[in-house]
Amino acid sequence: MRVLVLFVAAIIGVVPYLETRDPHAASEAETAAARIPLENYINAHATGNPEYIRKAFFPEAKIMAFRDGKLLNLSVEEFASRFSGKPAADESQRKRRIDSLNITGNAGVARIVLDYPETTLTDYMSLLKVDGEWKIINKVFYGEPKAKPSSAAAQLPDDREAVKQAVLDYVEALYEADSARIQRSVHQELFKLGFERDKEGTYKPYRMTYQELYDLAGRWNKTGRIPKNSKKEIVVYDVADQTASAKLTARWGIDYLHLAKFDGKWMITDILWQTPPRS
């Protein structure tokens, strides 16, 4: 009797699995095979080689989109003719990915995203296994232009360099005992808070005004006890059109800096620093 009860329980435990399992679910091998035409399609865009398009698509496939109020309907050969045989000039900035792939039996659908500098293209592919080989039967797509950067954003590389230069002026002002570089890189309403560790290992905070920093720069390394080429590692974290943040690792420790643009010039407004952290 005990054996019968266990047997019945085992059957009951299996039944839900049998009921919910999709008998047509694709195996890993089948999924990998269905990815091949999708990868050929991506390779066509990456290399500009039209032969990848011919490998990816069924010969009678259609490529369609609704653009400028009209239906665009291309044959495979018409679509392949758009590939020049070489990568795009901005290929290094282009990204592509297979977002999803769903297969049932010998049919499937996939979504591919082409993320380009000026536009994002979304492809929806219908796939079919024909004579034992997966092919793209149909493609519909939508392209969405990206917002053009503002004039301020367009200056970002220059701004980033200007932010880095302001931090460099600050650290080299101290290394080279040159107060003038504090004057050109630090705002006079500076807020500076430091944490210095004493001999007992306790951090003690203290504040410094702009004038105190200016005076310190003139005397801190006046005797040249610290080499002018001492550590000055600068990492610019973020630059917006008006504000920025950066990190400085120097001889005295670590500084986290906020900067703002005044009359077109980047100036340090806040500094939070500490002596070298405990190892």
Residue ranges and their predicted role:
Residues 2-7, 127:
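Sec-dependent signal peptide recognition
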Residues 5-15:
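Bacterial N-terminal signal peptides
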Residues 15-51, 55, 143-180, 184:
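Short, low-complexity N-terminal intrinsically disordered segments enriched in polar/charged residues
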Residues 41, 53, 61, 110, ...:
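Hydrophobic pocket/interface hotspot
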Residues 57-59, 67-68, 114-116, 125-131, ...:
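A mature extracytoplasmic/lumenal domain signature
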Residues 62-67, 72-120, 191, 196, ...:
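Surface-exposed, charged secondary-structure patches
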Residues 71-73, 134-136, 202-207, 266-269:
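Tryptophan-centered short beta-strand motifs
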Residues 109, 120-148, 245, 254-279:
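Short beta-strand edge/turn micro-motifs at domain boundaries
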